[in-house]
Every structure is written in C-alpha cells, then in structure tokens.
Amino acid sequence: MRRPKKYESGEATQYISRRAALRKLQLSLNDFRRLCILKGVYPREPKHRRRAQKGSSEIKILYHTKDIRFLLHEPIVWTLRDYKIFAKKSGRDRAIKDFRNLKRRLALFPEIKLDHIVKERYPTFIDALKDLDDCLTLLFLFSTFPSLHLIPREQSNLCRRLTIEFLHYVIASKSLRKVFISIKGYYFQAEIKGQKINWIVPHYYPFKPQSRQEVDFKVMSIFVEFYTIMLGFTNFRLYHGLNLAYPPQFPSGVLQDNDETLKDESSFVSERIAALNFELLRTDKLQEDEEEPDIDMELLEQDGDSKRIIKMKQDAQEITRLRTLFKGLKFFINREVPREPLVIIIRSFGGKVSWDSTVFSGSTYDEGDESITHQIVDRPSLATQYISRDYIQPQWIFDCVNQRQLLPTNQYFIGEKLPPHLSPFVDAKRDTYIPPEERALHDPSLIETHAQSDDESEEETAAQEEEEDAVEQELLDAQLQRAYQEETAEYKKYGGADGVNEDEEDSDDEQLYEDEDESDDDEEEELDEKAQRLLEEKQKMSVQSGKVHKVNKRQVHKAEVDEHRLQARMVKPRHRNLFRKLIREKQSKEKEEWLLRKKRRNIDTDAKEQKKTAKRDARKAAAAAAAAAAQLGAK
C-alpha cells in the first residue's frame, strides 16, 4: 500500500486557486468572473489557509474544487469561447473591409441563454421570491440611468419595463405592507406568497457622471443581465397567479380612438402603463376587488385560543383593513411632489389619485374637481385653496400606512412642523435605543406622560400649590374648632356670665367629682380590657419593625465586574476571539444608545427653553401693548 504524500488529501484538495481554475476552464479573467456571477459561485475562506494553499503563506483567492468542477459542464463556457472566435473573425473582416461577410457574422452573433441557470439556481418559485430583494433594488437603480459606456440604453429600458410590471402586480394584489422615506430613497415592503420582499426606489435626481471609476459598472451590468431574466420569469408567474394578461394590457375602454392613440398605439400604451393609474386587462371576466387572505380562518378557529393563534387572527384582520385604508378617498398630487412612489402607495390601498396632465400622462381628473378629499403639497403656501379638501404634506401618506390607520391631518398641514418619521423596519423588542415617539406608538399609555409642555407643568404646579393651601386651611380650621370647643366646655363647667350660689356650686362640685370618679373607674376597666385584647393579638401575630437596607453601588459594580471576569475565564481558547467580538459589539451598542439619549435630552431642553423664551417675549409684548393702550386712554 502506497503511503499518501502531503497535501494529496484533506483540506488541500478541497480548494483551488483562481489561477488554477482559469487554466482548468481555459477562460480569461473577465469571462471567468462573468461565469461565476451568472452561476452564483463565489470565493471561499478556508479554515486553515496554509493547509489549503499546500504550505504557501501567500494570500490567494480560493474556490471550492467541486464548484469549479461544476462549471466545467456549463454550456455557457462554449458560448464564451465562441465570443473570442467571433471577435477574431469580425476583426479580420473589418481589417480587409469585407463588410458583406461582417454583416453575415453580426447576424449570427452568439447569445447567452440564461433560462436554464435561473431554473437551476431557483428550483421552486418561493426560492426565487426569497432572493428578489437585491434583484429589485439593482433594477430600480439601473432604470434611472441614462445611456452610458458600459450600460446600453436597451438594458435601462428593460429594467424600467420589468420594474413597472412588478409595481402593477403589487398594486393589483394589494400586497404592500410597509413604506419609509430615507436619504437613500424610498423603502418598500411587500408580502407575496408569505414571503416579505424589501426593495429601495432611489430618489429622482439628475444623473451626475463620475470622473473617477469608483464603481465597476461592468460587473454590475452582469448582475443586471441575470436579474432581468429572473424578474421576467417572476412577473410572468405572478401575473398568471392573479389572472392578469402578460405582458400587461389595458381593457378596450381605456384605448379610445383619438389622434394620440391612432398615431402610435404602442407608445400610448407604454406611457399609460408607466403611469400606474389604470386597471390592467384580466384573462377572466370576474373583477375581484380584494384578494382572499392566505390564512384559513376556519382552521384557526378549530385550534385552541393560544397566544400565537390569537396574534395570527389579529394580524389577518389588520391586513384586511389595511388593504382598504384609502378606499373612498381621492388625492391630487402637486407638481413638486414625487409622483410614482405616492401613486404606488395610494393605489395599493384602494385610493384614487391624479396629477397635473402637463407633468405626466395618465391623469384622470383635474385639480378643480370638487370631489377631491386630499391634495398633497410640498411647498410653504398656495395661492388658491379649496375648502372641501385637506392640504397635506407627503409624509402623511407614509405614516398612515405604517400605523395602519388614517391619522389626523392637523400635524401635516402646509407649513406645519412635521412629527418624527419613524422607520417601520426596526424590531420593537430590540435592545438598542428606542425614541419616545416609537415607544408611545407601541404603548399608548406613554403618550400622556411623554414630553409634557410648559403649560401643563405650570398648571400642575399651580394645582399642587392650591392643594397645599387647602390642606393648611383645613388644619387651621380644625385647630380653631378644637380650641373653641375647649373654651365652651370650660365656660359651661365653671358657670357662665350669670352667677350661681356657693352652696349650689359646692353641691355641683361634689356631684361632678363623684361623676368623674365613676367615669374614671369605668375608663380604667375599659383600658384593662383593651390591654388584654392587644396582648392576645400580639401573641397571635408578631411584627418586627423594618430596617432600611442601603445598597452599596460600589460593591454591586465590583460583583458584576468579578462575575464578568469569571465568565471571560470560562470561555474556551478557540472561542475567545468570538467572545471579545460580542463584548465589543455590546459596548458599542451601549455607547451608541447613551449618545442618542444624551442627544435627545439636549434637543428636548433646547425646545423647552425656546418655548419659555417665546412665551416670555409674548407676555412682555402684551404688557407693553397694554401699557401703551392705557397711556393713550389717559390722554
């Protein structure tokens, strides 16, 4: 039996360097990178790098050997090799100016087919939905790009078309759940087939080309190439699940025969689809306003009343109400407000929306429509206003969706200072800093106690002073009444202003002394009985006086430190780095929470000081105005 040599088995055979993989696949570095992106193969970090690299201490990019062996049987490898042959032959035809042969070769340009890769990477439809977050975020980003050197116009147009189709599905299925405005863009969360999908829609700013190539658009374009195929498959499956025609089409009532439609029907339809303001054509004739919930309520009713089942029932009822949150409301979007995010949100929850026809095609009613209930404005003032509608800022739409109810509009009027815009994508049970407004949302009892105004504090102090004065007055009245009773008793005891005879006085005194002796004897007997009763009760129940226990904070802190040191000593040597990392993360979180609390405290104190100074100035101004008026009246 041959003795195995070193690095012929074990970890050394499980990994392969990138250079060896390129030699094995006979591909260039760019083609290898493209193949790895399309197939989902990525570099690996070995447990023992020196063993994996066969004794070499140089840091190399390593892949699993089985992944490279898996790439050997990929049909795309032959297409990538055909690209080299095509480039050589087309270059030769250009050099000799054989344009006839060049035209023939361009017609036979080798195309990469990615259908089998999508099916291979996502065996089930749920797997594709789980990996849809990055896909949507990247495609929404590329849909805003103009034609660049490494991003062709056709790719940007395809990204725009696929994302609009997905938004139409979200509107038709009413699957939107959470929304949020951030510096990066608009965050959305939809629940499709039980999977929560999050994506970001960037803000609509003019594109600014970068002088330095900090972003590798070529690599991103390869990701987009795969994600477009994936989202196309997903949209097809989603549309057929709702009985919608794919590609999206309009009913015949929308396409009216006029000059605009007869000139170019395809561009008219594409513009109306991009408007997101029309219902799509269904393959069945039944128009279902609301999709039935995925949870079987009858099955839940058969189970016991456990907390989990009750919570599922409550969530199902909340989602049913949420789908019709804006039902019966008509919105009008002003020119300065971003149109597309608000149209998605309003239509996803049953509302109707329109805008100025000069901004974008697809508006359904004008600003002068009297049935409009809300107009969304993002400017300090308006020249003309209608009494029949509320003029609100765009944040009202987002906050209503996140709190799943229609909020009062008085805090969102034109020119009003908006309340804090809280993110719905945070965990309420987390250990980090939670703003007071968010705590008040989860616990309504905190609303009254949080951030009391100066008026309330002044009223409370005045009420406390009144109560103290009333208590003092009651004590004084009680003392006066007691003194008056004692004086009247003495007055009756020793006679009054009308004098009496001495004999009568002596007889009265004797009688009085006798009565007092009898009463004293009775009182002594009663006291003896009470004392015996108290002794019996004490024998039954013994109570000792409590002692105040003062906590020594220094000793408590020392005990915690000793416990932490003991815990650190008990950690195994191989887990010490992980333990230190966890401790550092905990300390950084505590420090961040402390800084945020301090910052919020400073903000609250500054706001209170500003309110006090404003009230003081207002009082001074009122007093000065009153004095001036009095002087004028005297003259």
From Swiss-Prot:
Q: Where is the composition biased (Basic and acidic residues)?
A: 529-540
Q: Does the keyword Coiled coil apply?
A: yes
Q: Where is this region: Disordered?
A: 437-472, 489-561, 600-619
Indicate the segments forming the BRCT domain, all copies.
321-414
A GO cellular component annotated for this chain's UniProt record is: preribosome, large subunit precursor
Regions of biased composition (Basic residues) lie at 547-556
**Where is this gene product found?**
Nucleus, Nucleolus; Nucleus, Nucleoplasm
Keywords from the UniProt entry: Coiled coil, Nucleus, Phosphoprotein, Ribosome biogenesis, rRNA processing
Using the UniProt record, give the first listed, main subcellular location: nucleus
Q: Which regions form coiled coils?
A: 596-628
Indicate, by first and last residue, each region the UniProt record lists as having compositional bias (Acidic residues): 454-472, 500-528
Q: Extract one GO BP annotation from the record.
A: maturation of 5.8S rRNA from tricistronic rRNA transcript (SSU-rRNA, 5.8S rRNA, LSU-rRNA)
Q: List the disulfide bonds.
A: none
Q: Which residues carry this modification: Phosphoserine?
A: 453, 457
Instruction: Describe its function.
Output: Required for maturation of ribosomal RNAs and formation of the large ribosomal subunit.
Q: Which HAMAP family match?
A: Pescadillo
Q: Which family does it belong to?
A: Belongs to the pescadillo family.
Q: What is this protein called?
A: Pescadillo homolog
**What high-level taxonomic lineage is stated for the organism?**
Eukaryota, Metazoa, Ecdysozoa, Arthropoda, Hexapoda
